[in-house]
């Protein structure tokens, strides 16, 4: 996780290790001490692309670790995928009225780098009309003839790790 915290969060996929094996033979001239080697076999090796899994409630910084061609002269390398917590719609209900819990943004089921489009319904609190993050624009009811069915949320911000006040 990008913030280093793991307690109370979904378990992440175990690290994936890909190895490339190269071989060659060598000889040492017993008179001169000179060593000679054959060419490496294979000369290059392709490491496979690794898809980043979706982790509920989080977005990843990359959709996959790209395939990579390595040679015997390459140093060991490591790729890290960082997950950041998705933001939420944060209802600000006036004192004395029933509180509404934060509504986390959904995950995209196929792209770990984006929030989903299956947005939650903002619950209706009698006596109030929820407004968007600008603090003045009312949210539109799911059913204009029956606001008790809740409201359509505003769009998720371009940085999906940021909360949206309602």
Q: Where are the model-predicted features located?
A:
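Extracellular modular ligand-binding repeats in secreted and cell-surface proteins
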Residues: 1-166
